[in-house]
Amino acid sequence: MSGLIKTAGLQKLAHYKRIVVKIGSALLVEPQTGLRAEWLKSLINDVAKLHQKGVEILLVSSGAIALGRTLLRLPRGALKLEESQACAALGQIELAKTYGDALAQYGLKTGQILLTLLDTEERRRYLNARATINVLLRFGAVPVINENDTVATSEIRYGDNDRLAARVATMMGADLLILLSDIDGLYTKSPHRDPTAEFIPFIASITSDIEKMADVAASELSRGGMKTKLDAGKIANSAGTAMVITSGKRMNPLAAIDRGERRSFFAASEKPVNAWKTWISGHLGPSGILTIDPGAAKALESGKSLLAAGVIAVDGMFHRGDTVAIVDTNGVEIARGLVSYGKNEAVRIMGCKREEIESILGYEARSAMVHRNDMVLRCLTDST
């Protein structure tokens, strides 16, 4: 399959009110020569044209560490954590200046937002970040968002900007998330290694069969690979945000989407979750795991709460109100929610009926281990 394609459900970009565009390091920075200035100018030209048509654009941009590294002329090879953070500090200033100067050519302002994982995982900080970005958009500015790599550690980081972009898209209620990548979409296998790989232009929902393709069709250049892009899609689609994966190697990559260049379109859920459940669903790192029996799994599918009686194993370390993943006996995540008990209590009461819990804990039992109002179901079908 080659040339221009039609993708069911994808409209011209000017029809969307709010779009988040994720830009990877490999697109923005050449290891030897530094910033790809001409490519960035072409992207900003696309952004400016959409902005003139009333579309709000948010840019989630990698590249700070890579740019800082080229500025320091560091040799190839792994960097220590503090070296990466120093590169990020140098590169972030240069990156912000570059975006600011490029957008200024079109009379546009830009505002830099540096986020850590806790800024989207803690409810109050999440709401504050959302309010700040909304004000920037109201002022007509183009927010440029990145992970705050100068302070993020392995324990408190997104790890890739695909999922950060999805979190931003759902937080801001974006209509469309565009992941500009080194690969032009989703394939059944790796197109770099297998000429029989089939391109998939339209994905109605990200099922387990679709996820299996990510293991064999991963990008060879992208840090996150196809798996993190599908993780991003699950976060975005469940909240009502559609997603596009396409090659960012082309000049004017957003205009290329409108021209019909190859891309994969992931449809938004027809029944998006509400804002509260969007926040729950988007949690990237659940604090614990509750394994449940088949009867409990069926109850969740029918919209019931998770009772302690249906829990057969408890893992991780969590407190009341933390986010936990709920998995079946095969280890497949079927839901995610806010737990009503801490780890120690959950271990003591798992498998117990409600009337038994009070005597075990010494106080009146709460209605559920995870209440349905604090729970988001994952895709449970295997069909594509």
Swiss-Prot record:
<feature type="binding site">
    <location>
        <position position="22"/>
    </location>
    <ligand>
        <name>ATP</name>
    </ligand>
</feature>
<comment type="function">
    <text>Catalyzes the transfer of a phosphate group to glutamate to form L-glutamate 5-phosphate.</text>
</comment>
<feature type="binding site">
    <location>
        <begin position="181"/>
        <end position="182"/>
    </location>
    <ligand>
        <name>ATP</name>
    </ligand>
</feature>
<dbReference type="GO" id="GO:0055129">
    <property type="term" value="P:L-proline biosynthetic process"/>
</dbReference>
<keyword id="KW-0547">Nucleotide-binding</keyword>
<keyword id="KW-0028">Amino-acid biosynthesis</keyword>
<dbReference type="InterPro" id="IPR001048">
    <property type="entry name" value="Asp/Glu/Uridylate_kinase"/>
</dbReference>
<keyword id="KW-0418">Kinase</keyword>
<dbReference type="InterPro" id="IPR041739">
    <property type="entry name" value="G5K_ProB"/>
</dbReference>
<dbReference type="InterPro" id="IPR019797">
    <property type="entry name" value="Glutamate_5-kinase_CS"/>
</dbReference>
<dbReference type="InterPro" id="IPR011529">
    <property type="entry name" value="Glu_5kinase"/>
</dbReference>
<dbReference type="InterPro" id="IPR002478">
    <property type="entry name" value="PUA"/>
</dbReference>
<dbReference type="Pfam" id="PF01472">
    <property type="entry name" value="PUA"/>
</dbReference>
<feature type="domain" description="PUA">
    <location>
        <begin position="287"/>
        <end position="364"/>
    </location>
</feature>
<dbReference type="GO" id="GO:0003723">
    <property type="term" value="F:RNA binding"/>
</dbReference>
<comment type="pathway">
    <text>Amino-acid biosynthesis; L-proline biosynthesis; L-glutamate 5-semialdehyde from L-glutamate: step 1/2.</text>
</comment>
<feature type="binding site">
    <location>
        <position position="161"/>
    </location>
    <ligand>
        <name>substrate</name>
    </ligand>
</feature>
<dbReference type="InterPro" id="IPR005715">
    <property type="entry name" value="Glu_5kinase/COase_Synthase"/>
</dbReference>
<keyword id="KW-0963">Cytoplasm</keyword>
<dbReference type="InterPro" id="IPR036393">
    <property type="entry name" value="AceGlu_kinase-like_sf"/>
</dbReference>
<keyword id="KW-0641">Proline biosynthesis</keyword>
<dbReference type="Pfam" id="PF00696">
    <property type="entry name" value="AA_kinase"/>
</dbReference>
<dbReference type="GO" id="GO:0005829">
    <property type="term" value="C:cytosol"/>
</dbReference>
<feature type="binding site">
    <location>
        <position position="62"/>
    </location>
    <ligand>
        <name>substrate</name>
    </ligand>
</feature>
<comment type="similarity">
    <text>Belongs to the glutamate 5-kinase family.</text>
</comment>
<dbReference type="GO" id="GO:0004349">
    <property type="term" value="F:glutamate 5-kinase activity"/>
</dbReference>
<keyword id="KW-0067">ATP-binding</keyword>
<feature type="binding site">
    <location>
        <position position="149"/>
    </location>
    <ligand>
        <name>substrate</name>
    </ligand>
</feature>
<keyword id="KW-0808">Transferase</keyword>
<dbReference type="InterPro" id="IPR015947">
    <property type="entry name" value="PUA-like_sf"/>
</dbReference>
<dbReference type="GO" id="GO:0005524">
    <property type="term" value="F:ATP binding"/>
</dbReference>
<dbReference type="InterPro" id="IPR001057">
    <property type="entry name" value="Glu/AcGlu_kinase"/>
</dbReference>
<protein>
    <recommendedName>
        <fullName>Glutamate 5-kinase</fullName>
        <ecNumber>2.7.2.11</ecNumber>
    </recommendedName>
</protein>
<dbReference type="InterPro" id="IPR036974">
    <property type="entry name" value="PUA_sf"/>
</dbReference>
